[in-house]
């Protein structure tokens, strides 16, 4: 049976399908984890330890010896995405109450949802697009983009902008697994190869356990809003990253558009932040549902936008004559 191939036909399927299965279990049999307990219960409710292993393995994929072009590209896209999310968060905080919007089309929307949905890029999608287009050096920026996975960067964003405070112990506890992974991955490339293979394999496990914090009612309620947010992510972050890629990273903008998505791992961020700061607890569930929808939407739209921009740039290059000093005289 081609179970994996079938799941991957759904955009972000290895994250979204287990998430929905977990939500189904929590909706129709909410006491399952307590009933079985033991290893089964831990598999259902163990989001944080599973996420800790994921962050460690992501850290192990980072190569400190990346070329200058790859480093410039990766850092530009990384800081650009985080900076844009921070800016939107600061603006949104002026209008959205701490417990989120309670009525109307935007019911359930919170500053947490906005920052988390904008803050993380689907690194796997970016890597696939760049490799498909034959952009090997641009693909190398994946290592930097992947550092957005997990709650740490979102915690930093909230802390730096003053939107929320986290104890230094919490920040340290979040980043230590990542740093340990970085160190081991650079000390031994065999360990990097070993742990890098774990990254995609562990995603369904924390997605399933995370799904057990949701229910179908909230997922259905956030549907249209989640679609709107997903479209906004592609348009807003795609435009800003396109400009940064062209004028800072000295690229043609295509890689920037390819980074205009929401990572599947972002679905875990509201829960993790609520565990670290109880003020996020009232909006964590609705934020998770919005982000889950955005993951699907951006997984569909980001490739279309990337291909469209790449096509337009190639057409422009074909129409532009070479400089006179490069023209040959017969």
UniProtKB/Swiss-Prot annotation:
Its main location: membrane. It catalyses: 2-dehydro-3-deoxy-D-gluconate(in) + H(+)(in) = 2-dehydro-3-deoxy-D-gluconate(out) + H(+)(out). GO terms for cellular component: plasma membrane. It is found in: Cell membrane. The chain crosses the membrane at residues 10-30, 42-62, 77-97, 100-120, 140-160, 163-183, 200-220, 224-244, 254-274, 289-309. Induction: Induced by galacturonate and negatively regulated by the KdgR repressor. Is subject to catabolite repression by glucose involving the ccpA gene. This is 2-keto-3-deoxygluconate permease. It comes from Bacillus subtilis (strain 168).
């Amino acid at each position: 049976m081609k179970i994996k191939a079938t799941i991957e036909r759904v955009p972000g399927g290895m994250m979204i399908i287990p998430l929905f299965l977990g939500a189904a279990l929590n909706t129709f049999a909410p006491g399952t984890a307590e009933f079985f307990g033991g290893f089964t219960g831990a598999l259902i409710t163990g989001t944080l330890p599973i996420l800790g292993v994921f962050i460690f393995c992501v850290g192990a994929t980072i190569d400190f010896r990346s070329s200058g072009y790859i480093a410039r590209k990766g850092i530009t896209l990384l800081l650009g995405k985080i900076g844009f999310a921070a800016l939107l968060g600061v603006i949104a905080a002026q209008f959205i109450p701490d417990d989120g919007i309670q009525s109307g089309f935007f019911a359930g929307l919170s500053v947490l949802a906005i920052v988390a949905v904008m803050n993380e890029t689907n690194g796997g999608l970016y890597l696939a697009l760049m490799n498909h287009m034959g952009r090997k050096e641009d693909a190398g920026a994946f290592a930097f983009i992947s550092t957005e996975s997990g709650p740490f960067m979102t915690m930093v964003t909230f802390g730096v902008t003053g939107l929320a405070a986290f104890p230094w112990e919490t920040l340290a506890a979040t980043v230590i697994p990542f740093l340990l992974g970085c160190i081991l991955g650079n000390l031994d490339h065999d360990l990097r190869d070993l742990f890098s293979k774990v990254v995609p394999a562990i995603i369904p496990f924390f997605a399933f356990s995370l799904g057990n914090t949701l229910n179908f009612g909230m997922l259905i309620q956030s549907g249209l809003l989640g679609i709107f947010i997903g479209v906004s992510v592609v348009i807003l972050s795609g435009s800003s990253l396109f400009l940064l890629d062209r004028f800072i990273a000295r690229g043609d903008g295509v890689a920037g558009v390819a980074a205009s998505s929401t990572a599947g791992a972002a679905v875990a961020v509201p829960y993790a932040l609520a565990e670290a700061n109880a003020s996020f607890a009232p909006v964590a569930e609705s934020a998770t549902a919005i982000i889950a929808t955005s993951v699907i939407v951006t997984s569909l739209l980001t490739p279309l936008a990337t291909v469209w921009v790449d096509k337009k740039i190639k057409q422009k290059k074909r129409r532009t004559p070479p400089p006179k000093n490069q023209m040959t005289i017969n």
